[in-house]
């Protein structure tokens, strides 16, 4: 018997930024590579990553991920100065950087990371052009989500 091999790209999620989906309306998503050091890759493999308060800034025509926390493993060499909060360069094409930068400058949008995942053997970050939610919008989203959950619960019990 032959086993079917799926043609889907292997994509395993490492870390999610749930706060970004709560605080922003996502307009458009992009996938970017990250410039990492060796100890950072090991920390990512161990799952020691947090994207909660991170965001993207543009300096000198390049995109940088700020505020992502990668905790170093306890066995990182002592001669290295492991900085868990350092700025990490994002690898994007020039047209993508131009589009993101233009939207941030002209429309007042924000670029936030949504998740960190493996794509084949590379660490990728999914970033999004996003518009901030007001407090009443956040409450409305929560009400809508709870109503959907309650509706499914009732249909399941009576169905």
From Swiss-Prot:
Recorded GO terms, molecular function? RNA binding
Q: Which Gene3D superfamilies match?
A: 2.40.280.10
Any stretches that span the bilayer, and where are they?
Answer: none
Give the signal sequence positions: none
Cell compartment(s), UniProt: Cytoplasm
Q: Which CDD domains match?
A: SmpB
The UniProt entry, under Pfam families, shows: SmpB (PF01668)
Task: Write out the entry's keywords from A to Z.
Answer: Cytoplasm, RNA-binding
Q: Which GO terms describe its cellular component?
A: cytosol
Q: Which GO terms describe its biological process?
A: trans-translation
**Sorted alphabetically, which PANTHER family does this protein's record hold?**
SSRA-BINDING PROTEIN, TMRNA-BINDING COMPONENT OF TRANS-TRANSLATION TAGGING COMPLEX
- What is this protein for, i.e. what is its function? Required for rescue of stalled ribosomes mediated by trans-translation. Binds to transfer-messenger RNA (tmRNA), required for stable association of tmRNA with ribosomes. tmRNA and SmpB together mimic tRNA shape, replacing the anticodon stem-loop with SmpB. tmRNA is encoded by the ssrA gene; the 2 termini fold to resemble tRNA(Ala) and it encodes a 'tag peptide', a short internal open reading frame. During trans-translation Ala-aminoacylated tmRNA acts like a tRNA, entering the A-site of stalled ribosomes, displacing the stalled mRNA.
Q: Which family does it belong to?
A: Belongs to the SmpB family.
Q: What is this protein called?
A: SsrA-binding protein
**What does the organism's lineage look like at the top?**
Bacteria, Pseudomonadati, Pseudomonadota, Gammaproteobacteria, Legionellales
Q: Which gene encodes it?
A: smpB
